[in-house]
Design a protein with these regions (language model features):
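Glycine-rich acyl-CoA binding loop
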Residues: 141
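Hydrophobic residues within well-ordered alpha-helices
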Residues: 174-176
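Conserved catalytic-core motifs of GNAT/GCN5-like acyltransferases
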Residues: 180-196
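GNAT-family acyltransferases
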Residues: 2-138, 151, 155, 197-204
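Conserved GNAT acetyl-CoA-binding A-motif
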Residues: 154-164
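Conserved beta-strand-loop-alpha-helix junction that forms the acyl-donor binding cleft
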Residues: 163-172
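Flexible ATP-lid and adjacent glycine-rich G1/G2 motifs of the Bergerat
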Residues: 148
Length: 204
């Protein structure tokens, strides 16, 4: 005889109407990102500091215009001063909150930001990612994304961590490598009537 499979319900009745709503969740707001240093085995992620990172990042990214293909609103840059001006504009924002990805040598090799920050819904996104060729397809490149995701979930208290990639970008496989496999629904998108709101994909 086949063993019965019990599927846990993903909804509960509304206390007044009886209609199904998402399972109850803790609605305590998450914390906003801050100036932390996240240590890994291959390097670290730290708050972007212009004084330390500008020269490092220009050295490893100058002449590699392809790294700006999907951030063409910003780069590529013609010279170091133009790049430094753009980097300085990143430092002042609380959203996106920018971090430098630093190798064991102490030199910055890339940047990433936590953005679209919605503490009340406990949803956050990683974006504005710029990896120099020295960081692409390296253990540190993967580890940096893991460190940011762990920080968002375990320290800040977010429930949903988004990473949006252009489907034709060569780095599209990176999110699943670094964190988790992708699902075909918007899970834990926001808290609604005290429960978890999910948006399923259109029927095919």
């Amino acid at each position: 005889m086949a063993e019965a499979i019990i599927v846990k319900s993903e909804s509960e009745p509304h206390p007044f109407t009886g209609q199904p709503v998402g399972l109850p969740v803790d609605a305590t707001p998450a914390r906003t990102p801050g100036p932390v240093t996240l240590e890994g085995c291959y390097g670290r992620v730290e708050k972007l500091d212009m004084r330390q990172a500008a020269a490092d990042l220009w050295k490893v990214s100058a002449g590699h215009d392809h790294i700006w293909t999907y951030l063409s609103a910003y780069g590529p840059f013609s010279d170091a001063p133009a790049f430094s001006d753009w980097l300085a504009s990143r430092v002042v924002f609380a959203d996106p909150y920018s971090y430098a990805i630093v190798g064991t040598s102490g030199n910055a090799l890339g940047i990433a930001a936590l953005m679209a920050i919605r503490p009340a819904m406990r949803v956050i996104e990683v974006g504005h990612i710029v990896y120099s060729p020295a960081l692409m397809r390296t253990p540190l490149g993967t580890e940096a994304q893991y460190l940011l995701a762990r920080y968002a979930f375990e320290t800040l208290g977010y429930r949903r961590y988004e990473w949006k990639c252009d489907p034709i970008a060569s780095s599209t496989s990176s999110p699943s490598t670094a964190t988790a496999s992708l699902a075909r629904s918007s899970r834990e998108f926001f808290v609604w009537v005290g429960g978890d709101r999910r948006t399923p994909p259109p029927a095919t």
